[in-house]
From Swiss-Prot:
Residues 530-540 have a biased composition (Basic and acidic residues). Interacts with RPD3I, RBAP1, the Arabidopsis cyclin CYCD3-1, the mastrevirus replication-associated protein A (RepA) and the begomovirus replication-associated protein (Rep). This is Retinoblastoma-related protein 1. The keyword ATP-binding does not apply. It comes from Zea mays. Belongs to the retinoblastoma protein (RB) family. Pfam families: DUF3452 (PF11934), RB_A (PF01858), RB_B (PF01857). The gene is RBR1. PANTHER family: RETINOBLASTOMA-ASSOCIATED PROTEIN RB -RELATED (PTHR13742), RETINOBLASTOMA-RELATED PROTEIN 2 (PTHR13742:SF22). Gene3D superfamilies: Cyclin-like (1.10.472.10).
């Protein structure tokens, strides 16, 4: 750890990497303790049963051996899969050397060792079966462990078949090694003390006390229901602060975890939970069995697709894969590049790890590319793959997505997103175009990796795609000319995407097969002039909790965006990745930018629909869900500049409060924020630091950020007031009128979010049929004129005019009695259909099921009256 660059420019990234490392080792130590307790009894040697640590000495010995193994295999601390392989190797050594009397099982009929050979139990194969590890990698870890033991204790490894120790009875000893005196009673204590001294000396040189992680893992909270699909930083910071300081005491962390109830004690059989370790090992098994067996070059069918283009693209594709993956997983560059990416390639032990990840990513890329080619040819609108297969941006996005999935599979902590984007010259908006297609065309993708891609897409949609330098603005300036001036004023346009030669020059190496003239730039595809490049961004930590969704085709376009004859057509990928100014090859007069922006906005609306519904449920105003959604949709379509350099949750919060003010609900901004903090995606900076422009300080433009109240009053209200006022102009509740379709007033109407769980009415008694529905707003509230309302916010305000919040007994009583439940806030495409978010939402409890944009028809008249 001391080798990390302590400069301020990299301190934030280093802090996150250290926290991720603590989280990785915490997960590994939990796995190790659980596996050890399944294989061995609690008390070993002459350890005092009342020992303050409650850690069996054999367990402690194995943990120290694992830490020593790290010195020979740095990849153990790079990703969770490698870490587990090292720990399973340690368990194998303990099973070979620890006396059989300390085992918690017998060889005969054991459920732990089920793999058999003619000579007995196959120990290594059984462990690989139990923990989903690779037998080849496990044997490699065992070999490195043997070398570490020889160096530390000056012992020579002997063949177990020659020594024939008693504790290996009925175990096939072929290829097993044995160390005499390693764990014998007479020398075990001295060996353990020697290991502890070595670990303590190494801890003093670094910043973390790795030994304490084994003891502290019961103190660090852990959610057994966590899917573990991405690195969990929720509690690692607390652990890091404790473990990084040698002065912190740990005696309050030594509680022994209680065992789950057994059926004999009245409990039920516990179902195995998906933990970060089981998730990582399951996805690693998929990568090993499905992807690793593939060739590391294009298949014959893919070569046929590539050679059938206007020119043979096979060599260009393979060359690009080599260059781009070398940029992501550097193996030949200097140590300086390694530090910038968190990958210290100066260490020779890192090169095999990076090479292995490159091979896995390339195989996955070729597999998905072939599947996409097959699917595109089945599209009636595509008869030539040349535009797609010659598009540089498409290939880079597909390679970057493959590399990110490989990193996610191994649960790596040394390269954190968006490092993949920075290495390849892509932007978040670029990557968002490929994720849905990647999931659709890789049918064997495990559920956990689909969840990871869902979480990644949420990050891209909610904020990263709206950052300065995103290629989103290069498409917006074409699709929405009205925002061009604001984009240019703020300098939001992306830089051109760097060519492959630029990537090679960054690597400071010469890739075999490149032209001898580096100044001749390789074509970046047909949209070279518009290809953007992402500026550097700070690493965003991954979500802890995500929800799997089924990626579906985008909803049909609005009439003002595309002709009616094209609504049902599926746009090919070449339309998505083509230059924004190119005409859509499907037909019509629209540009490819129109297609791209429409698809992107439809995804934004789907994500916003789920988050709005969840937040409205939390604040108990479900009846206003559609109004909030409609205001958000109108802002996205007509006041798109409000999203520039911002997070969509900032607009959702403001829309909810604006609707609450218009409808005179008893809801304050403080209540909204308190409930928002309970959402899984919540980050404090979302409502505490919002961009509202730049100021000139001594000739330097400095971004100005304010709190959400200031943003709401100064920026949001002036822009969104017409949409909020239009809610009042629509008149009374729809159920009090007869709609155009002839629906009877007051009759039930399908919910605008029909597949989402309805919070009203709610059953409040388990023994009686008693239901409670939210109180409707009175007609009097809706008939109030706009001039009598205040659109502005103040934290701590009363819910009614001239009334103190302390006297609002109804609101206080409601908050006291509300039993809030955790609502899943992740994007789930199964829950909201495309037709719902495409504009076919109906009014709650009545009204037409037509496009809700009709509710804003008198918008222009309303603006005139207000002005």
């Amino acid at each position: 750890m001391s080798s990390l660059d302590p400069s301020p420019a990299t301190s934030t990234q280093q802090q996150k990497q250290l926290e991720s490392l603590v989280n990785l080792l915490t997960q590994g130590s939990r796995f190790y303790r659980k596996a050890y307790n399944e294989l061995f009894s609690g008390v070993t040697t002459e350890q005092d049963p009342d020992s303050s640590t409650n850690i069996p000495e054999y367990m402690l010995f194995g943990w120290h051996l694992f830490l020593m193994l790290h010195l020979r295999s740095p990849e153990l601390f790079k990703d969770l899969v490698s870490c587990i392989h090292g720990l399973v190797a340690v368990l194998a050594i303990l099973l070979i050397h620890v006396p059989a009397k300390f085992r918690s099982f017998t060889i005969e009929g054991s459920s732990h060792l089920i793999k058999q050979t003619e000579k007995g139990v196959d120990l290594i194969a059984s462990l690989c079966h139990n923990y989903h590890t690779s037998e080849e990698r496990l044997k490699e870890m065992l070999h490195k462990s043997h070398n570490a033991i020889e160096d530390i204790f000056h012992m020579k490894a002997l063949s177990a078949s020659e020594c024939k120790p008693e504790n290996l009875d009925k175990i096939d000893t072929d290829d097993l090694m044995y160390f005499k005196g390693l764990i014998d009673m007479e020398c075990f204590q001295s060996n353990l003390e020697k290991m502890e001294k070595l670990c303590n000396s190494n801890s003093c040189k670094g910043e973390l006390d790795f030994k304490s992680i084994l003891i502290n893992n019961d103190y660090i909270p852990y959610d057994e229901n966590s899917t573990g699909d991405s690195t969990n930083l929720g509690h690692s910071k607390c652990a890091f602060e404790t473990l990084a300081s040698p002065t912190k005491t740990i005696k309050n962390m030594l509680t022994v975890p209680s065992s789950p109830l057994s059926p004999a004690t009245g409990g039920s059989v516990k179902i195995v939970q998906m933990t970060p370790v089981t998730s990582a090992m399951t996805t690693a098994k998929w990568l090993r069995e499905v992807i690793s067996s593939l060739p590391d070059k294009p298949s014959s069918k893919l070569q046929q697709f590539l050679s059938s283009c206007d020119r043979d693209l096979t060599n260009a594709v393979t060359e690009r894969v080599s260059i781009v993956l070398e940029a992501i997983f550097p193996t030949k560059s200097s140590a300086n590049r390694g530090v910038s990416l968190g990958l210290n390639c100066a260490n020779a032990f890192d090169i095999p790890w990076a090479e292995a990840r490159k091979v896995e990513a390339s195989k996955l890329y070729y597999r998905v590319l072939e599947a996409i080619c097959r699917a595109e040819l089945q599209n009636s609108n595509v008869n030539n793959l040349t535009p797609l297969l010659s598009n540089e941006r498409f290939h880079r996005c597909l390679i970057a997505c493959s590399a990110d999935l490989v990193l996610a599979t191994h649960k790596t902590v040394i390269m954190m997103f968006p490092a993949v984007l920075e290495s390849t010259g892509l932007t978040a908006f670029d990557l968002s175009k490929i994720i849905e297609n990647f999931v659709r065309h890789e049918e064997t993708l495990p559920r956990e990796l689909k969840r990871h891609l869902n979480s990644l897409e949420e990050q891209l949609l909610e904020s990263m795609a709206w950052e300065k330098g995103s290629s989103l603005y290069n498409s917006l300036i074409v699709a929405r000319p009205s925002v061009a001036s604001e984009i240019n004023r703020l300098g939001l346009l992306a830089e051109p995407m760097p060519s492959l030669d630029d990537l090679v020059s960054r690597q400071n190496v010469r890739i075999e097969g490149l032209p001898a003239t580096p100044s001749k730039k390789r074509a970046a595809g047909p949209d070279d002039n518009a290809d953007p490049r992402s500026p550097k961004r700070s690493c965003n930590e991954s979500r802890n909790t995500v929800v799997e969704r089924n990626l579906q085709t985008p909803p049909p376009k609005q009439s003002h965006m595309v002709s009616t004859s094209l609504k049902a057509k599926c746009h090919p990928l070449q339309s998505t990745f083509a230059s924004p100014t190119v005409c859509n090859p499907v037909g019509g007069n629209e540009k490819c930018a129109d297609v791209t922006i429409h698809i992107f906005f439809s995804k934004i609306l789907k994500l916003a629909a789920i988050r709005i519904r969840n937040l409205c449920e939390r604040v108990q105003c479900v009846e206003q869900t559609e109004r909030v959604y409609n205001v958000f949709k109108q802002i996205l379509e007509q006041q798109t500049t409000l999203f520039f350099n911002r997070h969509i949750d900032q607009l959702i919060l403001c829309c909810l409060y604006g609707v609450a003010k218009v409808c005179q609900l008893e809801l304050t901004f403080r209540e909204i924020l308190n409930n928002y903090k309970r959402e899984a995606q919540c980050k404090p900076e979302v409502f505490s630091s919002i961009y509202i422009g730049s100021t000139n300080r001594n000739g330097v433009l400095v971004s100005r950020h304010v709190g959400i109240i200031t943003f709401y009053n100064e920026v949001f209200v002036p822009a969104a007031k017409p949409f909020l006022v239009s809610l009042i102009s629509s008149g009374t509740h729809p159920e009090d009128k007869k709609n155009a379709s002839g629906q009877i007033p007051g009759s039930p109407k399908p919910s605008p979010f029909p597949n989402l769980p309805d919070m009203s009415p709610k059953k409040v008694s388990a023994s009686h049929n008693v239901y409670v529905s939210p109180l409707r707003q009175t007609k009097l509230d809706l008939l109030l004129s706009p001039s009598s309302r205040s659109f502005y916010a103040c934290i701590g305000e009363g819910t009614h005019a001239y009334q103190s919040p302390s006297k609002d007994l109804a609101a206080i009583n409601s908050r006291l009695n509300y039993n809030g439940r955790k609502v899943n806030s992740r994007l789930n495409f199964d829950m909201v259909s495309d037709s719902v978010v495409a504009g076919s939402l109906g009014q709650i409890n009545g009204g037409s099921t037509s496009d809700p944009a009709a509710a804003f028809s008198p918008l222009s008249k309303k603006r005139e009256t207000d002005t």
